C-alpha cells in the first residue's frame, strides 16, 4: 500500500512526523508537504509562480514551496508513478471543526486527493500534545478504508480530542457544526508607524449541539464527519428552478 501524506503546518511539523511514522506500519509512506506553515490556505493553487521542490529524503520526503493543494497535485501528477493508494492529511495542530473546514489547508489536501480519485482522510488533533492518539485513529481508518472504501465523492474529516488514548471514549459519526462569525481584526503598527492588520481568532461555536463535531469532541469522542467534494445544494435545485422561472 502506497500512502501519500501531506499537511498544512509544514514539512517539519510534529503532527506530520508522528502521522508518517505511524503509517509506516501499513505500507510505503511518502511525505510531500509545504516548506512552511500554510494554515488557512484552503484549496488554493499556485498559478503565478513556479513551484519549487526540495528532496529531503529520496523517495520518502519532499518539501514544496507551495500550498497543501499544490503538494498533493504535484505528488499525484508528477512525482509518484504508480499513484498512491490513499491520501492522508495531518495531523493538524488544532481543530478543524464546523466552519473551519472552509479555510483548512489540512482538509484541502485531502480534498485534492479525492478530486484526483483517491480515498482521502484529513486528521486534526484538538490541541498540540497527544499526537500519538490521533495517529492511532488515523491508522485504524486507513486500514478500514483499504478493505471498505468510501463512496467516490467523500472524504473523512477526523478530529481527535487532545487526550491520552485510554481516555478517549470512542468514535462518533457527526455533522459539521458552525461558529459565530469571527469579526475581530487586530490592528498594530509596523516600525515605520504604518498600520498592519492581523485576522483575529475564529468566532465562538454556535451550532454545537448533539450530533455535531463540536459536541463529540466536548464529550471526549473522536469526531468523523463525511465531507463531499461535490458542493451542489441538491435540496435547493427544485426551489431554485421555480425561482428562476419567475423571471420568464
UniProtKB/Swiss-Prot annotation:
Alphabetically ordered keywords of this record: Cytoplasm, Hydrolase, Metal-binding, Nucleotide-binding
Main location: cytoplasm
Pfam families: SurE
Disulfide pattern: none
Cofactor binding: number and manner: Binds 1 divalent metal cation per subunit.
Entry GO CC: cytoplasm
GO molecular function: 3'-nucleotidase activity; 5'-nucleotidase activity; exopolyphosphatase activity; metal ion binding; nucleotide binding
Enzyme class: hydrolase
Compartments where found: Cytoplasm
Enzymatic reactions: a ribonucleoside 5'-phosphate + H2O = a ribonucleoside + phosphate
Enzyme Commission no: 3.1.3.5
Cofactor(s) the record lists: a divalent metal cation
Positions that bind a divalent metal cation: 8-9, 39, 92
Cell inner membrane as UniProt keyword: no
InterPro entries xrefs: SurE (IPR030048), SurE-like_Pase/nucleotidase (IPR002828), SurE-like_sf (IPR036523)
Gene3D superfamilies linked: Survival protein SurE-like phosphatase/nucleotidase (3.40.1210.10)
Its job: Nucleotidase that shows phosphatase activity on nucleoside 5'-monophosphates.
Family listed: Belongs to the SurE nucleotidase family.
Name of the molecule in the record: 5'-nucleotidase SurE
Amino acid at each position: 500500500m502506497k500512502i501519500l501524506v501531506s499537511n498544512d503546518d509544514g514539512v517539519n511539523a510534529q503532527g506530520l512526523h508522528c502521522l508518517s511514522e505511524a503509517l509506516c506500519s501499513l505500507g510505503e509512506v511518502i511525505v510531500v508537504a509545504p516548506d512552511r506553515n500554510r494554515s488557512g490556505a484552503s484549496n488554493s493553487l499556485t498559478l503565478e509562480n513556479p513551484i519549487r521542490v526540495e528532496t529531503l529524503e529520496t523517495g520518502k520526503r519532499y518539501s514544496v514551496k507551495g500550498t497543501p493543494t499544490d503538494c498533493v497535485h504535484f505528488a499525484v501528477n508528477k512525482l509518484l508513478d504508480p499513484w498512491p493508494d490513499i491520501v492522508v492529511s495531518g495531523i493538524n495542530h488544532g481543530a478543524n471543526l464546523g466552519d473551519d473546514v472552509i479555510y483548512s489547508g489540512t482538509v484541502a489536501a485531502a480534498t485534492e486527493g479525492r478530486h484526483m480519485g483517491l480515498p482521502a482522510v484529513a486528521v486534526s488533533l484538538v490541541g498540540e500534545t497527544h499526537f500519538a492518539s490521533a495517529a492511532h485513529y488515523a491508522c485504524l481508518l486507513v486500514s478500514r478504508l483499504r478493505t471498505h472504501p468510501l463512496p467516490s465523492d467523500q472524504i473523512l474529516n477526523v478530529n481527535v480530542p487532545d487526550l491520552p488514548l485510554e481516555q478517549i471514549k470512542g468514535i462518533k459519526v457527526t455533522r459539521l457544526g458552525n461558529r459565530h462569525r469571527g469579526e475581530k481584526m487586530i490592528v498594530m503598527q509596523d516600525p515605520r508607524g504604518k498600520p498592519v492588520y492581523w485576522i483575529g481568532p475564529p468566532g465562538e461555536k454556535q451550532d454545537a449541539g448533539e450530533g455535531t463535531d463540536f459536541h463529540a469532541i466536548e464529550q471526549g469522542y473522536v469526531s468523523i464527519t463525511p465531507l463531499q467534494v461535490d458542493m451542489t445544494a441538491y435540496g435547493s435545485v427544485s426551489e431554485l428552478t421555480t425561482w428562476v422561472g419567475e423571471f420568464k
